[in-house]
Protein backbone atom coordinates (compact mmCIF):
# COMPACT_ATOMS: atom_id res chain seq x y z
CA UNK A 1 0.00 0.00 0.00
CA UNK A 2 1.40 3.41 -1.03
CA UNK A 3 0.45 5.78 1.76
CA UNK A 4 1.66 9.03 0.17
CA UNK A 5 -1.32 11.18 -0.80
CA UNK A 6 -3.83 8.79 0.73
CA UNK A 7 -7.06 10.09 2.31
CA UNK A 8 -8.14 8.86 5.76
CA UNK A 9 -11.93 9.05 5.72
CA UNK A 10 -13.39 5.87 7.22
CA UNK A 11 -12.03 2.90 9.13
CA UNK A 12 -13.87 0.85 6.49
CA UNK A 13 -11.18 1.92 4.02
CA UNK A 14 -8.51 0.20 6.15
CA UNK A 15 -7.23 -3.36 6.02
CA UNK A 16 -5.77 -5.01 9.11
CA UNK A 17 -2.33 -4.51 7.55
CA UNK A 18 -3.05 -0.77 7.23
CA UNK A 19 -4.03 -0.57 10.89
CA UNK A 20 -0.93 -2.44 12.00
CA UNK A 21 1.24 -0.11 9.86
CA UNK A 22 -0.20 2.94 11.63
CA UNK A 23 0.25 1.38 15.09
CA UNK A 24 3.85 0.35 14.36
CA UNK A 25 4.68 3.79 12.94
CA UNK A 26 3.13 5.48 15.99
CA UNK A 27 5.21 3.29 18.30
CA UNK A 28 8.37 4.20 16.38
CA UNK A 29 7.61 7.94 16.40
CA UNK A 30 6.70 7.94 20.10
CA UNK A 31 10.05 6.32 20.84
CA UNK A 32 11.95 8.79 18.63
CA UNK A 33 10.09 11.73 20.17
CA UNK A 34 11.08 10.64 23.68
CA UNK A 35 14.71 10.32 22.58
CA UNK A 36 14.99 13.57 20.59
CA UNK A 37 12.21 15.84 21.87
CA UNK A 38 11.56 17.24 18.38
CA UNK A 39 11.48 15.59 14.95
CA UNK A 40 11.97 17.08 11.49
CA UNK A 41 10.08 14.69 9.20
CA UNK A 42 7.51 17.33 8.18
CA UNK A 43 9.85 20.32 7.96
CA UNK A 44 8.54 22.67 5.27
CA UNK A 45 5.08 21.04 5.26
CA UNK A 46 1.83 22.77 6.27
CA UNK A 47 -1.27 21.23 7.85
CA UNK A 48 -4.64 23.00 7.55
CA UNK A 49 -7.15 22.19 10.31
CA UNK A 50 -10.75 22.98 9.31
CA UNK A 51 -13.04 22.51 12.30
CA UNK A 52 -16.70 23.23 11.61
CA UNK A 53 -17.60 21.66 14.99
CA UNK A 54 -16.10 22.24 18.45
CA UNK A 55 -13.06 20.18 19.43
CA UNK A 56 -10.38 20.25 22.10
CA UNK A 57 -8.45 16.99 21.97
CA UNK A 58 -8.68 16.14 18.26
CA UNK A 59 -7.74 19.59 16.98
CA UNK A 60 -4.99 20.24 19.51
CA UNK A 61 -3.48 16.78 19.16
CA UNK A 62 -3.35 17.11 15.36
CA UNK A 63 -1.71 20.51 15.72
CA UNK A 64 0.69 19.18 18.35
CA UNK A 65 1.47 16.18 16.12
CA UNK A 66 2.34 18.41 13.16
CA UNK A 67 4.54 20.66 15.31
CA UNK A 68 6.28 17.60 16.81
CA UNK A 69 7.03 16.45 13.25
CA UNK A 70 8.62 19.83 12.49
CA UNK A 71 5.77 21.16 10.33
CA UNK A 72 3.50 24.20 10.54
CA UNK A 73 -0.26 24.62 11.08
CA UNK A 74 -2.93 26.96 9.70
CA UNK A 75 -6.71 26.74 9.99
CA UNK A 76 -9.80 27.69 11.95
CA UNK A 77 -11.45 26.31 15.09
CA UNK A 78 -15.03 27.26 14.20
CA UNK A 79 -16.90 27.93 10.98
CA UNK A 80 -17.96 31.41 12.13
CA UNK A 81 -14.40 32.68 11.60
CA UNK A 82 -14.31 31.51 7.95
CA UNK A 83 -16.03 32.57 4.72
CA UNK A 84 -18.52 29.73 5.27
CA UNK A 85 -20.40 32.30 7.36
CA UNK A 86 -20.72 34.38 4.16
CA UNK A 87 -22.27 31.43 2.35
CA UNK A 88 -19.19 29.86 0.77
CA UNK A 89 -19.70 26.19 -0.12
CA UNK A 90 -17.65 23.40 1.43
CA UNK A 91 -16.34 22.56 -2.05
CA UNK A 92 -15.01 26.09 -2.59
CA UNK A 93 -13.56 26.23 0.92
CA UNK A 94 -11.59 23.03 0.31
CA UNK A 95 -10.39 24.15 -3.15
CA UNK A 96 -9.21 27.42 -1.60
CA UNK A 97 -7.51 25.99 1.48
CA UNK A 98 -5.59 23.34 -0.43
CA UNK A 99 -3.71 26.13 -2.22
CA UNK A 100 -2.07 26.93 1.13
CA UNK A 101 -1.23 23.50 2.54
CA UNK A 102 0.04 19.95 2.05
CA UNK A 103 -2.63 18.09 4.05
CA UNK A 104 -6.12 18.92 5.38
CA UNK A 105 -7.78 17.71 8.59
CA UNK A 106 -11.54 18.36 8.66
CA UNK A 107 -14.31 18.00 11.25
CA UNK A 108 -17.84 18.68 10.06
CA UNK A 109 -21.37 18.12 11.47
CA UNK A 110 -22.67 16.64 8.20
CA UNK A 111 -22.14 12.95 7.47
CA UNK A 112 -20.18 12.49 4.26
CA UNK A 113 -18.55 15.94 4.38
CA UNK A 114 -15.05 14.49 4.74
CA UNK A 115 -15.61 12.16 1.78
CA UNK A 116 -16.75 15.14 -0.32
CA UNK A 117 -13.67 17.11 0.75
CA UNK A 118 -11.44 14.21 -0.29
CA UNK A 119 -13.10 14.01 -3.71
CA UNK A 120 -12.52 17.72 -4.30
CA UNK A 121 -8.99 18.11 -2.87
CA UNK A 122 -5.71 17.25 -4.56
CA UNK A 123 -3.93 17.09 -1.17
CA UNK A 124 -4.67 14.27 1.31
CA UNK A 125 -7.69 14.75 3.57
CA UNK A 126 -8.04 13.27 7.07
CA UNK A 127 -11.48 12.95 8.66
CA UNK A 128 -11.55 14.26 12.25
CA UNK A 129 -15.24 13.34 12.62
CA UNK A 130 -18.25 13.77 10.30
CA UNK A 131 -21.54 13.98 12.17
CA UNK A 132 -22.45 10.69 13.87
CA UNK A 133 -20.76 8.73 11.09
CA UNK A 134 -17.01 8.04 11.46
CA UNK A 135 -14.01 9.12 13.53
CA UNK A 136 -11.18 6.94 12.16
CA UNK A 137 -8.24 8.65 13.88
CA UNK A 138 -9.90 8.23 17.29
CA UNK A 139 -10.32 4.53 16.51
CA UNK A 140 -6.64 4.17 15.65
CA UNK A 141 -5.56 5.83 18.89
CA UNK A 142 -8.03 3.63 20.80
CA UNK A 143 -6.49 0.49 19.27
CA UNK A 144 -3.01 1.84 20.00
CA UNK A 145 -4.00 2.44 23.63
CA UNK A 146 -5.40 -1.08 24.06
CA UNK A 147 -2.30 -2.62 22.49
CA UNK A 148 0.02 -0.55 24.72
CA UNK A 149 -1.88 -1.52 27.86
CA UNK A 150 -2.30 -5.25 27.19
CA UNK A 151 0.42 -5.99 24.65
CA UNK A 152 -2.30 -7.39 22.39
CA UNK A 153 -5.86 -6.89 21.17
CA UNK A 154 -6.77 -10.51 20.40
CA UNK A 155 -8.49 -12.46 23.18
CA UNK A 156 -9.91 -9.45 25.03
CA UNK A 157 -13.49 -8.83 26.18
CA UNK A 158 -14.37 -5.24 25.32
CA UNK A 159 -17.48 -3.35 26.46
CA UNK A 160 -18.86 -0.24 24.76
CA UNK A 161 -21.08 1.79 27.13
CA UNK A 162 -23.49 4.67 26.64
CA UNK A 163 -24.58 6.35 23.42
CA UNK A 164 -24.04 3.63 20.84
CA UNK A 165 -26.61 5.12 18.42
CA UNK A 166 -25.11 8.55 17.77
CA UNK A 167 -21.55 7.99 18.99
CA UNK A 168 -19.24 7.99 15.95
CA UNK A 169 -16.28 6.80 18.03
CA UNK A 170 -17.99 3.52 18.92
CA UNK A 171 -19.21 2.95 15.35
CA UNK A 172 -15.66 3.18 14.02
CA UNK A 173 -14.14 1.19 16.89
CA UNK A 174 -16.64 -1.67 16.61
CA UNK A 175 -15.94 -1.97 12.88
CA UNK A 176 -12.15 -1.98 13.42
CA UNK A 177 -12.40 -4.66 16.10
CA UNK A 178 -13.74 -7.13 13.51
CA UNK A 179 -10.10 -7.57 12.46
CA UNK A 180 -9.33 -9.04 15.89
CA UNK A 181 -10.44 -12.00 17.97
CA UNK A 182 -12.46 -10.16 20.62
CA UNK A 183 -15.81 -10.48 22.37
CA UNK A 184 -17.84 -7.28 22.19
CA UNK A 185 -20.39 -6.22 24.82
CA UNK A 186 -22.77 -3.42 23.76
CA UNK A 187 -24.26 -1.72 26.84
CA UNK A 188 -26.80 1.03 26.26
CA UNK A 189 -30.37 2.19 26.90
CA UNK A 190 -32.86 0.71 24.42
CA UNK A 191 -33.20 4.12 22.75
CA UNK A 192 -29.45 4.32 22.09
CA UNK A 193 -28.63 0.83 20.84
CA UNK A 194 -25.95 0.33 18.22
CA UNK A 195 -27.51 0.69 14.73
CA UNK A 196 -28.84 -2.66 13.53
CA UNK A 197 -26.82 -2.68 10.32
CA UNK A 198 -23.57 -2.38 12.30
CA UNK A 199 -24.51 -5.18 14.73
CA UNK A 200 -25.52 -7.45 11.85
CA UNK A 201 -22.24 -6.71 10.05
CA UNK A 202 -20.21 -7.51 13.19
CA UNK A 203 -21.96 -10.86 13.58
CA UNK A 204 -21.63 -11.67 9.87
CA UNK A 205 -17.87 -11.21 10.26
CA UNK A 206 -17.86 -13.81 13.06
CA UNK A 207 -17.61 -11.55 16.09
CA UNK A 208 -19.34 -12.60 19.32
CA UNK A 209 -21.63 -9.68 20.20
CA UNK A 210 -23.66 -9.42 23.43
CA UNK A 211 -26.24 -6.63 23.84
CA UNK A 212 -27.52 -5.56 27.25
CA UNK A 213 -28.94 -2.55 29.08
CA UNK A 214 -27.29 -3.43 32.41
CA UNK A 215 -23.63 -2.66 33.07
CA UNK A 216 -23.53 -4.53 36.40
CA UNK A 217 -24.38 -7.81 34.67
CA UNK A 218 -21.27 -7.80 32.48
CA UNK A 219 -18.63 -5.57 34.08
CA UNK A 220 -17.01 -8.53 35.86
CA UNK A 221 -16.20 -10.14 32.50
CA UNK A 222 -14.59 -7.12 30.83
CA UNK A 223 -10.94 -6.32 30.13
CA UNK A 224 -11.77 -2.94 28.58
CA UNK A 225 -14.77 -0.69 29.26
CA UNK A 226 -15.07 2.07 26.65
CA UNK A 227 -17.41 4.74 28.04
CA UNK A 228 -19.15 7.42 25.96
CA UNK A 229 -21.24 10.42 26.93
CA UNK A 230 -24.87 10.79 25.92
CA UNK A 231 -24.53 13.25 23.02
CA UNK A 232 -27.19 15.89 23.56
CA UNK A 233 -26.24 17.77 20.38
CA UNK A 234 -27.11 14.77 18.18
CA UNK A 235 -30.70 14.38 19.45
CA UNK A 236 -33.43 15.77 17.18
CA UNK A 237 -35.77 16.08 20.20
CA UNK A 238 -34.76 17.26 23.69
CA UNK A 239 -37.45 15.06 25.28
CA UNK A 240 -35.73 12.00 23.82
CA UNK A 241 -32.46 13.18 25.35
CA UNK A 242 -34.02 13.69 28.78
CA UNK A 243 -35.30 10.09 28.76
CA UNK A 244 -31.75 8.70 28.62
CA UNK A 245 -29.73 11.46 30.33
CA UNK A 246 -27.70 10.02 33.20
CA UNK A 247 -28.45 6.39 32.27
CA UNK A 248 -25.08 5.16 33.56
CA UNK A 249 -22.34 6.27 35.88
CA UNK A 250 -19.10 4.38 36.43
CA UNK A 251 -18.10 4.92 40.07
CA UNK A 252 -16.22 3.05 42.80
CA UNK A 253 -19.30 1.04 43.76
CA UNK A 254 -19.77 -0.21 40.18
CA UNK A 255 -16.06 -1.08 40.01
CA UNK A 256 -16.33 -3.42 43.03
CA UNK A 257 -17.50 -6.08 40.56
CA UNK A 258 -14.71 -5.42 38.04
CA UNK A 259 -11.56 -7.45 37.43
CA UNK A 260 -8.27 -5.98 38.65
CA UNK A 261 -7.12 -5.86 35.02
CA UNK A 262 -10.11 -3.82 33.80
CA UNK A 263 -9.06 -0.67 31.98
CA UNK A 264 -11.53 2.18 31.46
CA UNK A 265 -11.32 4.31 28.33
CA UNK A 266 -13.28 7.37 27.20
CA UNK A 267 -12.90 9.48 24.03
CA UNK A 268 -13.80 12.56 26.14
CA UNK A 269 -15.27 15.04 26.87
CA UNK A 270 -17.17 13.44 29.73
CA UNK A 271 -20.21 14.80 31.49
CA UNK A 272 -21.18 12.63 34.49
CA UNK A 273 -20.78 9.10 33.10
CA UNK A 274 -17.46 8.53 34.91
CA UNK A 275 -17.29 9.88 38.46
CA UNK A 276 -14.06 11.84 39.15
CA UNK A 277 -13.35 9.42 42.03
CA UNK A 278 -12.43 6.84 39.37
CA UNK A 279 -9.64 9.04 37.94
CA UNK A 280 -7.00 7.95 40.45
CA UNK A 281 -7.75 4.23 40.29
CA UNK A 282 -5.61 1.71 38.40
CA UNK A 283 -8.55 1.18 36.04
CA UNK A 284 -8.59 4.70 34.56
CA UNK A 285 -6.47 5.17 31.45
CA UNK A 286 -8.46 7.86 29.60
CA UNK A 287 -5.83 10.57 30.09
CA UNK A 288 -3.10 8.22 28.83
CA UNK A 289 -5.47 7.58 25.93
CA UNK A 290 -5.48 11.34 25.22
CA UNK A 291 -1.66 11.39 25.07
CA UNK A 292 -1.68 8.51 22.58
CA UNK A 293 -3.52 10.71 20.09
CA UNK A 294 -0.29 12.58 19.39
CA UNK A 295 1.95 9.70 18.20
CA UNK A 296 -0.93 8.12 16.27
CA UNK A 297 -1.74 11.37 14.46
CA UNK A 298 1.97 11.97 13.90
CA UNK A 299 2.07 8.56 12.22
CA UNK A 300 -0.91 9.33 9.98
CA UNK A 301 0.43 12.73 8.96
CA UNK A 302 3.90 11.36 8.24
CA UNK A 303 2.48 8.48 6.20
CA UNK A 304 0.09 10.49 4.02
CA UNK A 305 2.74 13.18 3.47
CA UNK A 306 5.15 10.47 2.36
CA UNK A 307 7.91 11.68 4.68
CA UNK A 308 8.47 8.39 6.53
Swiss-Prot record:
Query: Cross-referenced InterPro entries, in alphabetical order?
Result: Asp/Orn_carbamoyltranf_P-bd, Asp/Orn_carbamoylTrfase, Asp/Orn_carbamoylTrfase_sf, Asp_carbamoyltransf, Asp_carbamoyltransf_Asp/Orn-bd
Q: Does the UniProt entry include the keyword Transferase? A: yes
Q: Which UniProt keywords apply?
A: Pyrimidine biosynthesis, Transferase
Q: Can you tell me which residues bind L-aspartate? A: 86, 168, 229
GO terms, molecular function = amino acid binding; aspartate carbamoyltransferase activity
Q: Report the domain of life of the source organism.
A: Archaea
Q: Which reaction(s) are listed as its catalytic activity?
A: carbamoyl phosphate + L-aspartate = N-carbamoyl-L-aspartate + phosphate + H(+)
Xref: Gene3D superfamilies: Aspartate/ornithine carbamoyltransferase
Q: What is its EC number?
A: 2.1.3.2
Functional note: Catalyzes the condensation of carbamoyl phosphate and aspartate to form carbamoyl aspartate and inorganic phosphate, the committed step in the de novo pyrimidine nucleotide biosynthesis pathway.
Q: Which family does it belong to?
A: Belongs to the aspartate/ornithine carbamoyltransferase superfamily. ATCase family.
Subunit info? Heterooligomer of catalytic and regulatory chains.
Q: Which PANTHER family match?
A: ASPARTATE CARBAMOYLTRANSFERASE, ORNITHINE CARBAMOYLTRANSFERASE, MITOCHONDRIAL
Protein name, UniProt field = Aspartate carbamoyltransferase catalytic subunit
Q: Which gene encodes it?
A: pyrB
Amino acid sequence: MDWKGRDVISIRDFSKEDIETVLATAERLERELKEKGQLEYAKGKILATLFFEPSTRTRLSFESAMHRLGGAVIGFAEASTSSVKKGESLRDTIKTVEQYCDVIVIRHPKEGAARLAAEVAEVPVINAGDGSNQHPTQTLLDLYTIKKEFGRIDGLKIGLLGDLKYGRTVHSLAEALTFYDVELYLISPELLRMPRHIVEELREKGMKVVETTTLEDVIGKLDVLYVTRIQKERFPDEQEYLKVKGSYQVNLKVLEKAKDELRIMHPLPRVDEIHPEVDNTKHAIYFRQVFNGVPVRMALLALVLGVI
